[in-house]
Structure formats: structure tokens, C-alpha cells
Amino acid sequence: MIKTAKISTLRLAITRNARNLSFTTLVRSPEVDNSKIKTLEDLTRLETLEGVDPELIKRLINEKTQEFNTQDELKLLKSMQMEQDRLNEVPLKRFTRPLWIFILMASTFYLGAHLVWWKLAYEKKEVELKHKVDSLETTLKDVMKEKATGPTPCNNKKSWYKFW
């Protein structure tokens, strides 16, 4: 900011002096050696801008402006690079809450699916056992009918263990 203010002040001083000069004045005053003027600071050391080539002034101002623009661009690039690096470094904190939410939702879905699976397995097993009970009941009824219609059991008073 200070460099920009310094340049704008320098430009203002140079342009004020350049407006007051006429072309004939610039051509007639040979006391300034244009080859010695290399920077804007050299221009500020002069008492007047009489005899200084306007193209030289313009070139020096453009060089300094380009220098400051380059510095500003470098600063901007550095700040953008730092910002990009900061954004690329993803902290673990950003993922903990979504991870917990995902785990809770996944476990809820799993438990719900498992409950449905158990219920279906229970119903299937219940149907199988009901068929088994029905078949055993029919077998029992058939055996009881045969026993009722069959020969009467002998009234053997001997104990079963005596046959051994």
C-alpha cells in the first residue's frame, strides 16, 4: 500500500512537471544527461524535469508499475497457494460427525433388516412345525384307531423285567 502511494505521488509530481514543460523547453535544455537516469529515484533527485525525455519518464513509470504489479501478483499467488494448501488439509473433525451418522443409520437399517429376516424365519419355522404337529396328530389318531379295533391286550400279570 505504501509503495502504491509512493508511486502515485511520484506520478503526480512527474505529470505536473511534464504538463508545465513545452517541447521546445525539453529540446533546448541540454543540462540533463538522460543516460544517467536509470530509475524513478534518479528522477526525484532532479530539481526539475526540464530536459528529461518524456519517453524515458514513461518507460521508468511503466517499469516500476510492472515491478509492483509483479510483486502483487506473487503475493496473491502465495496467498492463493496457502489457501489451497489449507483447503487440501482436511481435518478429521470434518468427518467424525458424518461418520457417526452413517454408522447409526447403517446399524439401524441392519437391525431392521435382521428383525424382518427373523420374523420371516419364525413364520416359516412355525408353518413347518404346524405341518409336523398335524402329521403327528393324524399318525396318533390312526394308531389309536388300530389299537381300539385290534385284539385286546392280554392280561399278562407277569412283570416285564422277568422276561430278561
UniProtKB/Swiss-Prot annotation:
Membrane topology (Mitochondrial matrix): 29-97
Membrane topology: Single-pass membrane protein
Cell compartments where the protein resides: Mitochondrion inner membrane
Organelle targeting peptide span: 1-28
Coiled coil segments of this chain: 121-149
Residues that span the membrane, as ranges: 98-118
A GO cellular component entry from the record: mitochondrial inner membrane assembly complex
Superkingdom to which the source organism belongs: Eukaryota
Alphabetical keyword list: Chaperone, Coiled coil, Membrane, Mitochondrion, Mitochondrion inner membrane, Transit peptide, Transmembrane, Transmembrane helix
UniProt GO BP: mitochondrial proton-transporting ATP synthase complex assembly
Mitochondrial intermembrane side: 119-164
Family from the record: Belongs to the INA17 family.
Record note on quaternary structure: Component of the inner membrane assembly (INA) complex, composed of INA17 and INA22. Interacts with a subset of F(1)F(0)-ATP synthase subunits of the F(1)-domain and the peripheral stalk.
Function comment: Component of the INA complex (INAC) that promotes the biogenesis of mitochondrial F(1)F(0)-ATP synthase. INAC facilitates the assembly of the peripheral stalk and promotes the assembly of the catalytic F(1)-domain with the membrane-embedded F(0)-domain.
Protein name: Inner membrane assembly complex subunit 17
Gene: INA17
